[in-house]
Amino acid sequence: SNFYVYMQIIKNKNFYTLAPVSALGLASFFTIQGLWANGWMADVAGLSQEEIGLRLLIVAVAMSFGTLGNGALVDYLSKKGVDRAKYLATGLMMLFIVQIFFALNIDTDGYWQWVILGLTGNIGVLVHPILNKTYPPGYSARSISTIAVSTFLLVFIIQFGIGYILDIWGPDESLSL
């Protein structure tokens, strides 16, 4: 039955060690890039709309290069003996570190953190080929859909959480235009 297949996927050690952190990485990136980046740059960093637009363009271009580049690079490196899971973990670590830099307001007008965010934002999708090698061939679509559902649930939770914190904090009137 379908329930049995999903339980087999979720109980797999590789799934429950890799999928949650990958889903969290994807969800945090989707949340920041899709909803909160513009507001953060305006309200926290105090950037103009022109400066914001340039940074959002940088994120979009870096995301495109990151998606293609990480896929090609992990394939190349895995042929040289580099473990795909370690590559994934390194990319996720970079993604989470740059998010900490945003939270701590480190170099708020810089470009480098937006480049790193874009390059590593979609790195969580590299979990799919890793996991698909651990299941029977018919399980891959269910594994991918389980991660996708988890990711989008986390997106909504993170969006709500950030919004809630910002509502408690309130706007900084000194940054108003």
Question: Which sequence ranges carry the predicted segments?
Answer:
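Transmembrane helix-loop junction
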Residues: 39-44, 75-76, 103, 133-134, ...
